[in-house]
Amino acid sequence: MKLPKKTWLQIISSTLVRTVYNTAFRMVFPFQPILMKGFNINLSQISRMYAGQSLIGFISPVLASISDTRGRRTGMLAGMVLFSVGTLVIVFWTTAGGFFAFLVLSMLAKAVFEPSVIAYFGDIIPYDRRGFVLGITEISWSLAFFVGVPVIGFFMDKVNLLAPFILLLVLGLLSFLVVLLLFPADKPPKANRPSIITNFGLVFKSGSALAALAVMLFICTANQMVNVVFGVWLNDSFGLQIAALGGASAVIGIAELIGEGGVSAITDRISKEKAVLIGVLGNVVASLILPFMGGTVWGAFLGLFVFYLTFEFSIVSMLPLVTGVLPAARGSLMALNIASANLGRGLGSLLAAPLYPWGFWMNAVAAAVVNLLAILALRYVIVQEDS
């Protein structure tokens, strides 16, 4: 199937827009030591902030379901409004409280925009091509880390701590205009408009949908156990500063780019279920070998490369899989999928800091164990083909 030029323009533009808010979402971890110092926050406090951010995000489906009730474009625009407000807050409220508000609002923006745009492509792209298309849009996640985060580091290092947030504010406003101009107004007729309660009821009555949400929960919990502490681990072990931490982000971003490219290339061919299984099993192995590769900087970078490659392949393969589980409530299920990911990150954040004093190896082993739970849940995910 050859995609129309208009669809390609929407794919590319949505990828760039997602790169902007993903940069805001991802910049925190590699520059965590610098941000902690700048906002006078300790590891325990920032861990609780991450947990609060993710747990507040668990209510995001109420907001994100707007894509089912008011249209996909409305959901995307609402997400960019939240993002712009979040960056505006920290520019004018440069305190720990302002930083927490930024964390929450940028996460809510992601949680509202992302299911809306994924549901949009789920509506117009056949299931047997959806892995290819969504794999391309997910490149925004790795672009944020190996392009966006180093740019943030440059502004942070050469200008000041607030400069990156001002840049993100400008880009957020431009992104709003891009969505407004390139995506069609698609508000469903009032007579056919589903209610939030109806759609959520469909999800919670579906064992397959609940299993899919559990897979996402476990994958993200496992990843966050490493995500929260890897910057501190590199800093504690090797004394890496801003530029070197930005380099680490580039290494991880390249790994994720390869993982996303792998989804576009092979997930539709081998089946989404098999792709997720391969990715999660690979991440189990990567988690277990990561602590043993931390004797040198390059060894640590290589271990992180494999860890994020396998994680990204598994989580991006989950997206087209979930779009086919419950087509009748696709937008609401995708919203709950993002909420499940946020809940997983919240749980992982709560567990990461208490585990780290025992050694980084404890975080890695715990991540492997939780990934095994994801594999168990995957057995119960059944797709309703709608291609």
Regions found by a protein language model. Name each.
Residues M1-K5, P184-A212:
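Juxtamembrane intracellular "pre-TM" segments in multi-pass secondary transporters
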Residues V28-F29, L210-S249:
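Extracytoplasmic gate region of multi-pass secondary transporters
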Residues I59-T94:
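Conserved MFS/SLC helix-loop-helix module at the cytosolic interface between two early adjacent transmembrane helices
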Residues S60-G71, E260-S271, Y356:
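Helix-to-loop junctions at the C-terminal end of transmembrane segments
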Residues E273-M318:
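C-terminal transmembrane helical hairpin of 12-TM major facilitator-type secondary transporters
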Residues A51-A64, A250-G259:
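Central cavity-lining transmembrane alpha-helices of secondary-active solute carriers
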Residues I136-L180:
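Helix-loop-helix hairpin linking two adjacent transmembrane segments in secondary transporters
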Residues V104-S140:
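Cytoplasmic helix-loop-helix junction between adjacent transmembrane helices
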